[in-house]
From Swiss-Prot:
Descriptive protein name: Ribosomal RNA small subunit methyltransferase F
UniProt superkingdom: Bacteria
Active site residues according to the UniProt entry: 241
UniProt KW keywords: Cytoplasm, Methyltransferase, RNA-binding, rRNA processing, S-adenosyl-L-methionine, Transferase
GO cellular component, one term: cytoplasm
Free-text function comment from the UniProt entry: Specifically methylates the cytosine at position 1407 (m5C1407) of 16S rRNA.
Keyword Hydrolase found: no
Database matches in NCBIfam families: nop2p (TIGR00446), PRK11933.1 (NF008898)
Subcellular location: Cytoplasm
Annotated source species: Shewanella sp. (strain ANA-3)
InterPro entries: Methyltr_RsmF_N (IPR031341), MeTrfase_RsmB-F_NOP2_cat (IPR049560), MeTrfase_RsmB-F_NOP2_dom (IPR001678), Nol1_Nop2_Fmu_2 (IPR027391), Nop2p (IPR011023), RCMT (IPR023267), rRNA_ssu_MeTfrase_F (IPR023545), SAM-dependent_MTases_sf (IPR029063)
Family membership: Belongs to the class I-like SAM-binding methyltransferase superfamily. RsmB/NOP family.
Length: 482
């Protein structure tokens, strides 16, 4: 049973729009959330994914504000996170309302090349934006919590997002270190989580207005930092999964009061069919749970109309960046290895070298070298030794899919496996082959045309090369439905 604190109810009763009823709000908070997922278009299309899953009993209801988002229903009670298709990165389990902020930032005419996600983990919005950018440009994903950075990186890797750079900082430093550097910024701010009560019945049990006001002060500092990091003419989206005005409208009003006409609010009333039901007088989206039968959420969009003064002197550039750009000879060698041995044509990105490691960075990252310390940049392609190159798993996941999808295998050694074999592979086991043949060495293991990783073809079996930290204890095969 959902626990709604009486002080919270009293506060919401004063803020709830006149056309909505408190009884409907409480009833909506008491209902379980509908299951929702987002198809990962970096690896598949929504139509192909539906064709794959409908025989397994899935039904799909489109989410109005996300072209590749769906409410789903199916008979299985198992955890979807263990599903083979989820481990492959074909979809992300994402609450419908949380798909709103990237949609608001990436309206049809947006062509953002440098984007900041200020509070990224676990990665739902980061990977949604990576898909909207189609792995072009640069997406800087920041997370303050060290443990959550690991989760963020795992999801970025699983979804094949190759143009991300991960950072681990308090979001309040970005306005200083990366002043007016980004075309667009998303800040899904840490918040009181009032909108999440449908999946966490105790979320509001100890709610207090004092805590709300304390959180809002942090949010004001974060939105100001995000605004300072935004280029003039750029767009900023501020969102929370909470419902009170202090953390939502109040934070946006603070920014406008601080920077005046440099802050121009943009109306989201036409963002999707039905958006007007949740639009505030300022043009923000205040999604109460009963409006769309979803989590409660808040989304605001603004444009930075002009440059504003920085608050701190420009920091000195950091020295000793550990990567150097590959020489023409090095670049040619790694390109030939990927093309000849793997059938993968490397994208026209920056090939970088650190010791014996070869990496692929977005070109846009050049402008950020020395300005801030990054935890992870782009994709690690391969290690080099006297025996030659050894491809890295993340490169196969991020880059092989496009080659296979286009049918451009170019003589690559690819082994397509069954669902049972895919399960065994993801659990770290070797795969016996029905017919013994000539050993082929390193091969790309695929299921349903999408790469799972690498293996060594020994003639009578595939010797598993999946990194140990990616081995699963359980893999769920969703059965066909009668």
């Amino acid at each position: 049973m959902v626990q709604l604190n009486q002080n919270f109810i009293n506060t919401i009763a004063q803020e709830l729009p006149a056309h909505l009823s408190m009884d409907d709000f409480i009833a909506a908070c008491s209902r379980p959330l509908r299951r929702s997922i987002r198809v990962n278009t970096l690896k598949t299309s929504s139509e192909d994914f539906k064709r794959l899953m409908q025989p397994k009993g899935w039904t799909f209801e489109p989410i109005p504000w996300c072209e590749d988002g769906f409410w789903i229903s199916y008979d299985e009670e198992e955890q979807l996170g263990n599903a083979l298709e989820h481990i492959q990165g074909l979809f992300y389990i994402q609450e419908a309302s949380s798909m709103l902020p990237p949609t608001a930032l990436f309206t049809p005419n947006a062509d953002w090349q440098c984007v900041l996600d200020l509070a990224s983990a676990p990665g739902s919005k980061t990977t949604q934006m990576a898909a909207l950018m189609n792995n072009q440009g640069l997406l800087v994903a920041n997370e303050y919590s060290a443990s959550r950075v690991k989760v963020l990186h795992a999801n970025v890797l699983r979804m094949g997002a190759s143009h991300c750079a991960l950072t681990h900082f308090d979001g309040r430093v970005f306005g200083e270190y990366l002043y007016e550097s980004f075309d667009a910024v998303l800040i899904d701010a840490p918040c009181g989580g009032e909108g999440t009560v449908r999946k966490d019945a105790d979320a509001l049990k100890s709610w207090s207005l004092d805590e709300v006001i304390e959180i809002s002060e942090t949010q004001k500092a974060l939105i100001e930092s995000a605004f300072l990091a935004l280029k003039p003419g750029g767009s900023l989206v501020y969102s929370t999964c909470t419902l009170n005005r202090h953390e939502n409208q109040g934070v946006c009003e603070y920014l406008q009061q601080t920077y005046g006409d440099a802050v121009q609010f943009e109306s989201l009333s036409q963002l999707f069919d039905g958006a007007e039901k949740a639009t505030t007088p300022e043009g923000f989206l205040h999604v109460w749970p009963q409006i769309y039968d979803s989590e409660g959420f808040f989304v605001a969009k603004l444009t930075k109309t002009r440059s504003v003064p920085r608050l701190q002197p420009e920091p000195k550039l950091q020295k000793n960046f550990p990567f150097t750009e590959a020489s023409a000879k090095q670049a040619k060698a790694i390109q030939a290895y990927f093309a000849d041995d793997l059938g993968i044509e490397l994208p026209d990105d920056l090939i970088m070298v650190r010791d014996d490691e070869f990496w692929l960075f977005p070109h846009e990252f050049r402008d950020f070298i020395g300005k801030m310390r990054f935890q992870r940049i782009g994709v690690k392609l391969a290690d080099h030794s006297k025996h030659g190159f050894k491809v890295r798993h993340e490169a196969i996941i991020a880059l092989a899919g496009k080659a296979l999808k286009a049918g451009a295998k170019n003589g690559a050694k690819v082994v397509e496996v069954s669902d049972e074999q895919a399960k065994e592979y993801l659990m770290g086991r070797d795969i016996p082959l029905d017919t013994a043949g000539k050993a082929q060495g390193e091969v790309i293991v695929c299921y349903g045309g999408a790469p799972l990783g690498m293996a060594k073809h020994l003639g009578n079996k595939l010797k598993n090369s999946l990194p140990r930290d990616l081995v699963k204890d359980k893999v769920l095969l969703l059965p066909p439905q009668a």
